[in-house]
């Protein structure tokens, strides 16, 4: 008989917090991310190595987050704390922002997004769930990917909706 003890609970992916861009914040803390991950089925996290909070490099939402298939990690980018300016905003993103409580104001040269209370946290929880959806899709796929980008995004959105319901039920 082996003297090693098997771990019955699968460990969560590592959460790494880097400094946000100057003037930005990370809406989700590492502790909040761990709490979200702990509420998800272990199968969804299988193979996910790391979630990293990172400074955004470019404009807000370009992108909000990124799943890197080869590295099996998720990058969540920093955001301005009060008001975001974006040159454009597609309908799906606007719908998700409004659902999280954002007020969207259209201007001549772009769009401003304003959050009150914990709305930005709710939005980033959905973004994280969407990226986990990409991870789940890539874990299940046995053959080379042939799906179009629109199909990949639809699967990730479906996963985000299911995760949102699961997290709401656990709260």
Kindly label every feature range from the protein language model.
Residues 29, 125, 152:
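Hydrophobic (often cysteine-bearing) scaffold residues that line and stabilize catalytic clefts
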Residues 126-139, 156:
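Active-site recognition of the HExxH zinc-binding catalytic motif
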Residues 1-117:
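A metal-dependent hydrolase signature that marks the N-terminal structural subdomain at the beginning
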Residues 147-171:
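Post-HExxH zinc-binding segment in Zn-dependent metallohydrolases
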Residues 117-121, 126:
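Basic amphipathic recognition helices
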Residues 42-45, 141-142, 165:
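Residue-level recognition of short, structured coil/turn motifs
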Residues 138-146:
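Substrate-binding clefts and substrate-entry loops adjacent to catalytic sites
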């Amino acid at each position: 008989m082996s003297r090693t003890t098997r771990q019955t609970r699968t460990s969560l992916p590592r959460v790494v917090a880097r400094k946000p861009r100057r003037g930005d914040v990370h809406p989700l803390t590492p502790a909040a991310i761990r709490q979200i991950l702990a509420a998800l089925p272990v199968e969804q996290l299988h193979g996910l190595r790391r979630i990293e909070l990172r400074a955004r490099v470019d404009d807000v939402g370009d992108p909000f987050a990124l799943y890197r298939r080869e590295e099996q990690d998720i990058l969540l980018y920093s955001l301005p704390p009060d008001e975001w300016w974006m040159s454009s905003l597609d309908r799906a993103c606007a719908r998700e922002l409004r659902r999280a409580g954002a007020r969207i104001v259209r201007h001549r040269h772009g769009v401003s997004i304003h959050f009150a209370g914990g709305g930005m946290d709710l939005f980033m929880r959905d973004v994280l769930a969407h990226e986990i959806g990409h991870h789940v899709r890539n874990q299940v796929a046995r053959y080379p990917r042939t799906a179009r980008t629109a199909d990949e995004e639809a699967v990730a959105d479906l996963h985000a909706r299911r995760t949102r319901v699961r997290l709401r039920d656990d709260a």
